[in-house]
Amino acid sequence: MRNDYRIWLYSMLKKLLKFSFILSFPLILSACGGGGGGGSSGEAVGGGNIPTCSDNTDYTTAEYNFMGGGNSAGTGAGKYGLGTVCAGAAYGRGATGNGIDIAVLDSGISISGGSTDINDIDTRIASFQSGADIIDSDNVPEDDEGHGSHVAGIIANEKNGTGLHGVAYEADLHIIRVLNESGSSEGNSVASGLDKARGISGIDIANMSLGDSGVIGTTCNSAATCETSLGSTLYTALENFGNADVIAVWAAGNEGSSSPSVISGAALYDDDFKETTVIVVGVGGDGLLSTTGYTSDKCGVAATICIAAPSGGNGEYLYSNYSSNAQSTYGVNSYARGANGTSMAAPMVSGGLALIKQEFSSLTNAQVVDRLFATATDSGEYSKSTIYGHGLMNLAAATAAVGDLQAIGGSNNLDGNGVTYYNLADNNFTSSAAFSNALTNALAGQTMEVYDSFDRANFETNVSSFFTSGSYTSQNTIENHMLRLRPKTTKKTKNKNLYGSFTVETDGNYIESSMFNSAGGFLALGYNQSTNSFENAVDPLSNFFNDSNFGNNYLVNPYFNSGSGQDYFMSFRGNSSLGFDSFTNANGNDLGLAFNLNPLSSSEDGMKNAGDLEIVFGANYEQNKFLNSTSSGVFATGDLSNTNFTGVKYKKNLSNDITFVGSGYAGYTYIDKASNSYISGSTPLLTSSFTLGLAKANFIKEDQRVGFFINQPQRVEDGSLNLKVPTSSNSDRIVTYNNLNVDLEPDSRQINFDIIFNKTITETSNLSANLTHVKNGDHAKESNSQNFLSIFYKKTF
């Protein structure tokens, strides 16, 4: 068995013509002021086989294109390389490789000026964390051959605006020299290098652009035969490496074989390290398996753990660093050389895995590998799995959501028992107009995690994106004014037309005014189909347009604004009544109760000069909502939130023609928590509303009436909501939640100004007009003022 595991030099040292081209390259670099490459002048790249990327153009710079041989203007052949795997799309999503540790087992790294200090290593590489030289038994892995420097640069060359950058240009590298100046291992240097890498804390990925002349599936076709072929020392090191949960990336080999080399493919027969092993074959400038310049091995029997990536070949090269000991330099502390072979394809994938790993902290290393495979381009030419395995690496797809994005509920473990996932469209919260934009304003800039349905990869989104500000605007449109002007279902009781919810009219002086004839005293029990539901039970004449004769306009107080339902209102005695409402609407189920007491209505005539006073006590119970907000999914509220409220209504006849009216309501809302909801609690919410106004009869003529009113719709005056949202997750699949306490008081106060005019035309018909001005609509400071004019003619038959 041979233990001389040769690196794949990909014809670099054999092609003197190409070497001469590189020597002349400094002249081009100097003229362009940075960047460069050589070895191929072809402009057409891909030959129709490489898929088109929607890369973020902010990142497709000359530095981006350099690796693929592009010129300093960022055009031409440079579209090969990073552009082939759609790296720009991943960069646009924030992936850089930052914080990901990658071990490079190779021939070492170029050292500046022959230094023996690891900190002086060529600064083109973004970040060095450690180094080891297995060959010379020290900690300075100086590259005497050049191959390792080239590989390291493809993975993590720094992005600094000049020259070229690597795939994961902010990754941390750990350089372990396991190959000598001839590009061969010595003794058990590869096994020792694997053990060394495994012992480095935090290593996520290891790149091995090295191989042997054997072919997987022949002499190595089972765990036992692979161990025999490789030797027990190396095979044990491979097993231990896999058990350490480090992703191992291997070059397939450059022999043109039907399957990869033995050392890269041994994992196929051993589950201990199969799930974290990736074998890489190379595609050339035309997107096809490289057969010119070098001939890549095929995926063959190892297709399930194999993928394709750019490697140079078929008329193209990949450019990267090269050791000063083996290659002429250009620029300060920079080295560049074109090369081809699966040794170049492997670091492309190692860098790609680093981007995926950084982007999705919730994934285990095995899941990172699964995602790499699942998102590869596998259509057309790349559907040939015996050649390309899972297909061509696609970093745009790998860093995007796979399947539906979902919110987690019910657990802090992504795979835990009882965990529930909700599609994003099923999670929303529309605020009540009572607290308007308070939630969206407070949550601006706050982020939370959501997860895709493929492997629960974590994505960041704005919490506020699930929230919509509540609005009274729908009540202020002309169309809705017309709806409000529409008479309610009518019934007759003692020859009295009843509009809106039924009420008790035991005292004409209280209910009616001098503006029209009193109906006299009577008792009534009735039913009505209402469009403004419980507010009518609380305050039967809830807006200016519900009454047929305008006389009760002063009773308006928009404390509740609910959906349609059934209202009941019943009298117990001359000065008290009970309202009851039960309904279902789009926002959930409500049950409301109200008790009205008029302490002055049955008083002596002399007391009535003090005016008419009504005191209201009540409660409103809401199912799956509060204050008429709507919510679902992880923002749902519980089955029974309740509001306890009280109100005072007062009327005083200032003269035979002029009446003062006023009312005010206040209440506390207690929010019920739902299971799996991010709404984890709240303080009691204090709300209020008020109405003040003057009504004048005999305006100009006896058949004309006018009213001037000012009112404030229901508004939260004090109270807060606590949200507990997921903000991070780790590879142990544990989710961390963060508490957000949100003040629900809106940033302004809506005030409505109304002028109402009514003219009696005949005993059965009248004409009404209403002019409304709305200031700070929806209690929002940024709202524009609104004006509405409504005209309504009504005839009773």
What residue ranges belong to the model's regions?
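C-terminal subdomain of the subtilisin-like protease fold in secreted/lumenal serine endopeptidases
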Residues: 79, 86, 204-209, 276-279, ...
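Outer-membrane beta-barrel "beta-signal"
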Residues: 784-797
